[in-house]
A protein has these predicted regions:
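N-terminal "domain-start" segment that seeds a small globular fold
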Residues: 1-28, 50
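Short active-site neighborhood of thiol/selenol oxidoreductases, capturing the structured segment around
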Residues: 25-49, 55, 69
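Loop/turn elements at helix/coil->beta-strand transitions in domains of secreted/extracellular proteins
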Residues: 31-35, 64-68, 95-99, 131
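Solvent-exposed loop/turn segments at secondary-structure junctions
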Residues: 42-45, 75-78, 105-108, 135, ...
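Structural microenvironment flanking redox-active thiols in thiol-disulfide oxidoreductases
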Residues: 49-94, 105-111
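Structural micro-motif
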Residues: 95-99, 114-127
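Thiol-/selenol-based redox modules, centered on thioredoxin-like
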Residues: 122-177
């Protein structure tokens, strides 16, 4: 499966980015929390549009328990400088209430995903990082939603939700305290 190469591996930090909501944050800042990173683009992307309500729901439901959802806007079809207002408009259209950064040059997308997963079929992907900073679950792209357009999207949502619940129940361990 695309994404297996990153499972069980430390997540590299995403570097310096402009934050349009929340932030600035680094993975080091979030140690001790479960982090769901979603790479997304404009509402024209059907996968991004289809997954946005799920991100909002997971943030609403599990945020108080220690889940931090982080949106990483990646311009398409290729890296380009993106006006903050444009990204803010997308964030508003999606209804995001969690931290969102602009990854103009795709450096975070490359560090966390593309450089580590040579067979990646999607850029609209999600990584679930545990309290110690280890990638523990990957949604390699497309949509995950409880009321998704197909059986796979619904299964992927349930798998993400179950992984979040499992990681929230784990302790961070002595190295992170």
């Amino acid at each position: 499966m695309s994404g297996d190469a990153v499972l069980g591996q430390p997540a590299p930090d995403w570097g310096q980015h402009r934050w349009v909501q929340g932030g600035p944050l680094s993975l080091a800042d979030l140690r001790g929390k479960v982090v769901l990173v979603r790479f997304f683009m404009s509402p024209e992307c059907p996968y991004c549009r289809g997954t946005a309500p799920s991100l909002n729901e997971l943030h609403r439901q599990f945020g108080p328990e220690g889940l931090v959802v982080v949106g990483m806007f990646t311009p398409k079809p290729r890296p380009r400088p993106t006006p903050v207002k444009e990204v803010r408009d997308y964030v508003e259209a999606y209804g995001f209430r969690f931290p969102v950064a602009v990854d103009d040059d795709w450096s975070a997308l490359r560090a966390l995903w593309l450089d580590r997963v040579p067979d990646a079929a999607f850029t609209s992907s999600s990584l679930l990082i545990d309290k110690r900073g280890i990638v523990r679950h990957v949604h390699p792209g497309g949509t995950f939603a409880p009321d998704g357009p197909d059986t796979q999207a619904r299964r992927d949502y349930e798998a993400m939700r179950a992984a979040i619940e499992k990681l929230l129940a784990e302790t961070a361990g002595p190295q992170e305290e």
